[in-house]
Amino acid sequence: MNCIVYNTIDFISKTFPKIYSNLYLEYLKEYAPIYNINKTQLRALMIIKNNRAISMTTLCNKLNIEKGSLTSMIDDLTSKGYVTRQRDISDRRKYLIIITKNGEDIASDFLDKLKIKLEEKLCRLDEDDQKRYIYALNTLEDILNKYYQK
């Protein structure tokens, strides 16, 4: 069991930051200013787009930011017309954050640009490495979905 724990810590502390930085963060930094938003706001739009409607608490957890920071960020995204707040019909004390057409257009445009950039990087891998890479991603996703669904 120590081996799996050590390997997990090693992956989280060494490998995951490389993956995140080289395959996602650098493009968030590059493209966010194009849309007059910061990289955290662009990440939020991507998360909201993938969830359609999301609570503030869930979005805080996914972005790993404080609720006060999220409130200011959502206020800004709302004023720019990228998201709206809607009462949660299952709990009227809460609000859901919903992406607008303009916000969805930004998220989709970023995703299209990200796909092009990632294709440039990942096509450098030979065919065997591409297969191993896809297999590793699928395996990791399957295991995480099996044991850690929320």
Positions of PLM-derived features:
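Residues within helix-turn-helix
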Residues: 56-57, 68, 75, 95
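Short, locally clustered residues in the helix-turn-helix/winged-helix DNA-binding domain
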Residues: 46-50, 111, 138
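Generic structural concept
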Residues: 13-17, 41, 45, 100, ...
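N-terminal leader segment of winged-helix/HTH proteins
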Residues: 1-35
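Charged, amphipathic alpha-helical coiled-coil/dimerization segments
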Residues: 76-132
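N-terminal helix-turn-helix DNA-binding core of bacterial DNA-binding proteins
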Residues: 25-66
